[in-house]
């Protein structure tokens, strides 16, 4: 009887230890001021899908865009990704990410609507670009 009790306690302890080591998914909100347009959203979405498998080992779970605020919220596994690596990946995709500026080569490939406001990009008066146009 004592052996069964000891074995049960041991198994429960190992199971609790294993579940305690599982990292919880976390969220990070990143300001991307040149992310104001549905076209920019599509470009960044495609880029994140591409790097998620290569760079982050599927560590990015999901992301949500707020085109009005120019923000992206990303849920990630902390054992596979971290906020600085995510910001660097966004910058490598051509978009500013908090204080990290987009890499120049990637930024040059963006369409005019996805450029920084000081470079003539972003929404134009009377043309909201946060909504996909209807054909």
Please tell me what each predicted stretch does.
Residues 1-25:
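Bacterial Sec-dependent N-terminal signal peptides
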Residues 14, 31-34, 107-108, 123:
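Processing junctions and N-termini across compartments
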Residues 15, 40-43, 117, 132:
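General secretory precursor processing signal
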Residues 24-32, 67-73:
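Acidic/histidine-rich, surface-exposed loop or edge segments in extracytoplasmic proteins
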Residues 56-64:
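A short linear hydrophobic-aromatic micro-motif
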Residues 64-108:
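Mid-chain, structured segments of secreted extracytoplasmic proteins
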Residues 107-134:
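Short, low-order "capping/linker" segments at domain edges
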């Amino acid at each position: 009887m004592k052996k069964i009790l000891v074995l049960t306690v041991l198994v429960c302890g190992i199971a609790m230890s294993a579940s305690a080591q599982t990292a919880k998914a976390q969220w990070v909100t990143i300001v991307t001021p040149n992310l104001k347009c549905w076209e920019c959203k599509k470009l960044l979405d495609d880029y994140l899908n591409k790097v998620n498998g290569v760079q982050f080992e599927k560590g990015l779970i999901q992301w949500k865009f707020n085109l009005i605020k120019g923000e992206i919220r990303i849920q990630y596994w902390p054992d596979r990704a971290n906020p600085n690596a995510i910001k660097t990946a966004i910058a490598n995709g051509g978009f500013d990410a908090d204080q990290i500026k987009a890499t120049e080569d990637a930024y040059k490939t963006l369409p005019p609507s996805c450029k920084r406001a000081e470079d003539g990009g972003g929404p134009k008066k009377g043309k909201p670009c946060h909504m996909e146009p209807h054909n």
